[in-house]
Amino acid sequence: MSGLKQAVRNTAKIIMFKGVYPLCYKVSSLRPLRKNKVIFAEIRSGTLTDSFRYIYEEIKTRGLDPQVYYVHNNKGGMGYLLRYLKLTWLMGNVGCVLLNDTCNLFGAFKFRKGTKVIQTWHSCGAFKKWGESITDLSFGESLEELRKFPAHTSYTLCTVSSKECIWAFKEAFGFDIDNNSVQAIGVSRTDFFFKEENRVKAFENLYKNCPNAQYKKVLLYAPTYRGDADKAYIPEKLDIKALKENFGSEWVLLVKRH
């Protein structure tokens, strides 16, 4: 990208985040608060993902008004600035907004009193570093950039799977030790496993595709990638031979890469 083009992009971003979005939200929030209005901000996907789906279905049964807004944050160009503008206006009078990924729009202004901002995150646990935990690495953003356009300052609640994860999320989000918005109340996407019919179907599908797994213990190896997305690599340090020698024939190893 040329220096001039990058300068234009940077200037446009500053104008929108520091001027246009705060003003738009201020005007939008003059409208009466609709406590039963809920917005699901799907940051990257073009469909409702599993971290949202169960919450969405439950909310519908409670007489609330759930709406889904697809941000498509992973598309190139500067179109996201206009999509952010529309979302900013929509959030001006909502009772609750949920998001499932990093989105720096949520740090561009202070939400009105009465609006809850809930981060459900898109993955379970904390199996890799992100956010402010990787500012010293080649594929991480600089701390200066993260602080200039903060993404996590407005959360009322961030749901995580266990107490052991809390410190990792607080570090990645740049939270002070006294910030208690990260709570281990569970992750909605794992509700799937608490329905017996889903477990039965999962085992049936497993045995269909891997007959040798029947009547055996199953070990799943599911490594995530590290590095820049376009140069990502998967760790290949798993010693399958050693596993076989130590676990014996009563185990089956399944490999599912990110």
Which role fits each region the language model picked out?
Residues 13-23, 125-134, 164-169, 203-209:
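Phosphate-binding glycine-rich loops and adjacent basic patches that engage nucleotide phosphates
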Residues 37-197:
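Active-site and donor-binding regions of nucleotide-sugar-utilizing enzymes
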Residues 47-55, 188-258:
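Conserved catalytic-core segment of nucleotide-activated headgroup transferases in glycan assembly
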Residues 23-34, 149, 207-213, 245:
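Short boundary motifs at domain starts and secondary-structure transition points
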Residues 30-39, 114, 214-217, 250:
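A short, charged/proline- and glycine-enriched loop
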